Curated annotation (Swiss-Prot):
Source organism of this protein record: Histophilus somni (strain 2336) (Haemophilus somnus)
Source species taxonomy: Bacteria, Pseudomonadati, Pseudomonadota, Gammaproteobacteria, Pasteurellales
The protein's name in its UniProt record: 5-methyltetrahydropteroyltriglutamate--homocysteine methyltransferase
Family: Belongs to the vitamin-B12 independent methionine synthase family.
Binding site for Zn(2+): 643, 645, 667, 728
Entry EC number(s): 2.1.1.14
Amino acid sequence: MTTFHVLGFPRVGAKRELKFAQERYWRKELAEQDLLDLAKALREKNWKHQADANADFMAVGDFTFYDHILDLQVATGAIPARFGFDSKNLTLDQYFQLARGNKDQFAIEMTKWFDTNYHYLVPEFHKDTQFKANPTHYVNQIREAKVAGHQVKPVIVGPLTFLWLGKEKGESFNRFELLAQLVPVYVEILNALVAEGTEWIQIDEPALAVDLPKEWVNAYKDVYATLSEKVNAKLLLATYFGSVTEHATLLKELPVDGLHLDLVRAPEQLVAFEDYNKVLSAGVIDGRNIWRANLNTVLDVLEPLKEKLGERLWIAPSCSLLHTPFDLNVETQLQENNPALYSWLAFTLQKVQELSVLKTALEKGRNAVNVELDASQVAADARANSKEIHRPEVAERLANLPKNADQRKSPFGERIKLQNAWLNLPLLPTTSIGSFPQTTEIRRARAAFKKGDLSLEEYENSMKKEIELVVREQEKLDLDVLVHGEPERNDMVEYFGELLDGFAFTKFGWVQSYGSRCVKPPVIYGDVVRPEPMTVRWSKYAQSLTKKVMKGMLTGPVTILQWSFVRNDIPRSTVCKQIGVALSDEVLDLEKAGIKVIQIDEPAIREGLPLKRADWDTYLQWAGEAFRLSSMGVADDTQIHTHMCYSEFNDILPAIAALDADVITIETSRSDMELLTAFGDFKYPNDIGPGVYDIHSPRVPTAEEIEHLLRKALNVVPKERLWVNPDCGLKTRGWSETIAQLEVMMSVTKKLRAELA
């Protein structure tokens, strides 16, 4: 027998049922019991899908109303004391307030789950944090699954990863010090699961794939010795998102009953564990991407393992299937429009079926599933040989780029003189980050056009009307460098993906980003080409309305890559450079059209960093090259801007400087300009625009607040190189607050200009 299991399942439902129910509940349009009933039905469906595919264990406890790390904070009594809630008697409303904030307390901070596009709620640890076991979340789900007749495997994030993912708050201390009192609470929680008749428990320790300090790594031995001794169940330690080869000796000696390895992200690590003498769960189906596996190739890896391990071989996805859309079968439009691409994809339900086929092949031989294996091989061969994917002219263009194609003609010191000469901007020039409010009217017009209820001419006229409004409002405010407001863009990545060859879009390919927020990433399936200009006519039209400088707006290659499902048949670095080269055609067309200030947004550069620091340089090198390629060939007097909206720059500042953008705008208002200090210490050489107010809030900042931030900025950045702008795009704001916020920004800027003149 070969055991097949999954590490976790999507929570939101095939049609985002949980999202819509949550949002109705928050609007007080749905009763609590109705939300609980819907969640129960979703869990039952998830288990049935696994059971129908002959999974041997159902993943239990992975379902959450918001986030699995928030559930663990509740289960360990580690919810922030500042809310004043009792974790043992927490109501559903209070649970959501932890995630979303309330009138007295801001929400728990959210950040990326390792290097995925999912976000978790960051535990807040204080020196005096007291943990208390509250296993209700897991126990209830075990009982539900058992009533439905399922064999269960509860899933819980392990104590070291849980602590690692948190942050110290209040008095200075190291959260590692809390481990000794956290472990007994885990023992209590796990024993509550054992009391429900649980045989196996999956404990996730993805922190093993990052650069852990030595004391953390060493702690695994004692922690798992305690859990093994005091919990009467078999423990499966799950690692994923990267290689754990460096910990192979430690992991093989841990007193656990099984180990899960991610053999998609790090297939090379298998060699280090082939002599493992307990259960080895092989993560062979990609839990993070949407490509169908070549099952014959996977069996070539599994069959020798099966021979060696026998029943100790388990098979699974590489990680939780939370990161993949639910069901490919509902993508009838994609099947009709691009049947070849459709045949190369596998969503959650298809991945579970792939594992089912592998299980049968390992138990009964390949002949027992030859129809399925043949279909898998046909799809793999068709994809490898498709002319739609592989366009020789793209590879040729990349191979024949001139030497130093990604370098500007002259250094910044020379370029800026040429730019200043024609721009003729005042001291502390002002601009916005790009988007302006997306009103209901804009969204309605876009939806009507997509449905065919609005002609192209009618749609374009409504967008032009909106662009004119945005231009006139900026002129009234007396901003220096204007933008067209991006009314025609639904999303900063999807908009470009729809206009570039090599991209496709699903209709129901949603994945959870956090809570009720889901995203539908584009699919990059082939070589990337820009068939025609994408933004030129809009920017050109906007420029025709004003004598002021108009800024062109593009999303950068790294961000497009990071926020998409990316093809896995060529390196990500190659895909990124293809996007950069395609964007360079757009940049040169904008320049030809008279748009000589062009912003290339890269909010995702940091989140693309590999988990291990040893791999950072390679990534930053190709990411930087792709960004610079996107503006290759521009004249020295064309000014390239970039925008980044994240909070940690210190450790990658040399790479940010190496992008060589003439102007960088960054999100700094919420950190009280602290981020800017790093730029000052580093002596960042080019122009910089730190955000002077937080656009994520409708609140209008006071003149004193903006002046305080600008004066702090002037202490770090020479006045000749300082720009003034909001933190981020204004798409989500209303018009009245947008105008009021920008008015304050402009009045403070003018006051300081007069003072500095």
